[in-house]
Amino acid sequence: MTFNVLPLIQYWDQPDPPAVIADRMEGWSQHHPGWSYRRFDRTSAAVFIQEHYGADLHDAFLDIRLPAMQADVFRIAALQAQGGVWIDAATRCLAPLEGWLNLRQPLVLMRRAHQQHPKICNA
């Protein structure tokens, strides 16, 4: 797999994120000029889900009212359908991924919850 076909995927529920979020999202495409980059909002994510999974998941996605939960469902749907790198919208890119990850091997990253403070978390 080459880097330029590995999609970077981000989600913000509205078409126009707040300036600080938009700036952080833009940083990912700037640090990865040869990569495929897709930013989804609620509408474009719903279309993607409809195309890849059909009406049931599409309707369930649209019934979700919390944007963070929408992002959780869409993350799984997008990565299952096409693979790629999911990047939380609030995450700032400081350096290209090629510099610190071996992306030629299958990889899943997840941060483990602290034992005294269990929670669902993503990395």
Task: Show which residues each predicted segment covers.
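N-terminal anchoring/stem segment of glycosyltransferases
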Residues: 1-55
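Secondary-structure boundary motif
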Residues: 30, 34, 63, 102-103
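Short, surface-exposed, polar/charged, turn-prone segments marking secondary-structure boundaries
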Residues: 35-39, 65-69, 114-116
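ATP-dependent phospho-/nucleotidyl transfer catalytic cores
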Residues: 49-67
